[in-house]
UniProtKB/Swiss-Prot annotation:
Pfam families noted in UniProt: SMC_N (PF02463)
Compartmental location: Cytoplasm
Molecular-function GO terms, alphabetical: ATP binding; single-stranded DNA binding
Disulfide bond sites: none
Taxonomic placement: Bacteria, Pseudomonadati, Pseudomonadota, Alphaproteobacteria, Rickettsiales
Homology family: Belongs to the RecF family.
Residues binding ATP, per UniProt: G33, E34, N35, G36, S37, G38, K39, T40
HAMAP family: RecF (MF_00365)
NCBIfam families hit by this protein: recf (TIGR00611)
InterPro entries from the UniProt entry: DNA-binding_RecF (IPR001238), DNA-binding_RecF_CS (IPR018078), P-loop_NTPase (IPR027417), RecF/RecN/SMC_N (IPR003395), RecF_2 (IPR042174)
Source species of the chain: Rickettsia akari (strain Hartford)
Broad class of the protein's primary localization: cytoplasm
Protein name per its UniProtKB record: DNA replication and repair protein RecF
PROSITE patterns per UniProt: RECF_1 (PS00617), RECF_2 (PS00618)
Length: 360
């Protein structure tokens, strides 16, 4: 098994940190500190070395320390391709982030070729009651760990979708270019939808196989393209291309693309109660979310033979003793780098004795 883990992390002008240097190894790491000390900021900085906008989905200017024009995050990381230096640079008001691998610039969506991460934060606990966009992005992050090229597919699909919207909005009479764009969107949609469905198969199997103290969930996706695949559509790309062509006039008026894989919704049901997670109590929702994360982590290791970095922000808060102890025992058996935040060590003393403690 190949382990992904940080050897060191360096922050400059990052949120509340002027400068911070951490040395770590492939063990559990507990960040201890009062609320506001910067525990979640450290997890967020690590998450920037994975496709997307980090675990907070924050605006870039919000990441820079107040009154500073830039911030830098550097990491020496044991990656899928061996030991490597990664860095990300953010300049205030530039609305762009520069990511480097061994001092060579790479696209953000290329990070899934090098790293593998799973995270759980308190903000994610509202994912079942929020908009479909949040759930879809959550699912796609899971897919990245099984299909590293998925991040690039989603990024390119969104680029061509914005190009299509622009052409329609500006009434550019270039039917050939529009046809090419819609063809690319259709081809990428087919791959994106198939990746999602295959990942859901993996995840459902993992959930059903894993016996733990958390409720089991039934996972599905509500999307026209994905449903066509399930129904055995043989000419999927042609179907998508035709739908995009037929909705041009409608989309021109709407100012957006009304059909496609960007409209799909990730649905989660409480298996035993047979109700959608959004109708469960907040405690049940957190428990279901933890169950999904545990299943994802287990199956990523089983299928890819890669142990991801696991980022857990306040995971023990509001858990009963049985579930807390189960998690502690589960984490103790893992041979992977795990980052956990808490305000104190009460109730996790045994776990702390086997972890690297970092006090803020």
């Amino acid at each position: 098994m190949k382990n992904i883990f940080l050897h060191s992390l360096s922050l400059a002008n990052y949120r509340n940190f002027k400068n911070l240097e951490l040395k770590t190894d492939n063990t559990p790491i507990i960040l201890i500190g009062e609320n506001g000390s910067g525990k979640t900021n450290i997890l967020e900085a690590i998450s920037l070395f994975y496709p997307g906008r980090g675990l907070r989905s924050a605006k870039l200017d919000d990441i820079c320390k107040a009154s500073e024009d830039y911030c830098i995050v550097k990491a020496l990381l044991q990656s899928q391709l061996g030991l490597a230096e990664f860095s990300t640079h953010i300049k205030r008001n530039s609305n762009r982030r520069i990511t480097e691998y061994n001092e060579s610039k790479i696209a953000n969506n290329e990070l899934s070729k090098f790293t593998s991460m799973v995270w759980l934060t308190p903000q994610m606990e509202g994912i079942f009651t929020s908009g479909s966009s949040d759930r879809r992005k959550f699912l796609d992050r899971i897919v990245y760990n099984f299909y590293p090229k998925h991040a690039e597919l989603v990024s390119k699909y969104e680029y061509y979708m914005h190009e299509r919207n622009k052409i329609l909005a500006e009434d550019i009479r270039d039917d050939n270019w529009l046809k090419i764009i819609e063809g690319k969107m259709a081809d990428m949609s087919s791959h994106i939808a198939n990746n999602r469905l295959k990942t859901l198969e993996f995840m459902q199997q993992a959930i059903d196989e894993l016996e733990n103290e958390f409720p089991k969930a039934d996972l599905s996706i509500d999307g026209i393209v994905e449903q066509r695949i399930l129904d055995g559509e043989e000419n999927l790309v042609n179907f998508i291309t035709a739908e995009l062509y037929q909705t041009r006039s409608k989309d021109k008026l709407l100012g957006r693309t009304s059909f496609g894989v960007h409209k799909s919704d990730f649905l989660v049901k409480h298996q035993k109660k047979n109700i959608l997670a959004k109708f469960c109590s907040t405690g049940e929702q957190k428990a279901i979310l933890i169950a999904i994360i545990l299943a994802e982590m287990n199956y990523v290791i089983k299928l890819t033979k890669i142990a991801p970095i696991l980022l857990l922000d306040e995971v023990f808060v509001h858990l009963d003793d049985t579930r807390r102890q189960y998690l502690i025992e589960f984490f103790t058996t893992l041979s992977m780098q795990l980052w956990v935040t808490d305000t104190n060590l009460e109730g996790i003393e045994n776990f702390a004795s086997k972890a690297q403690l970092i006090k803020l």
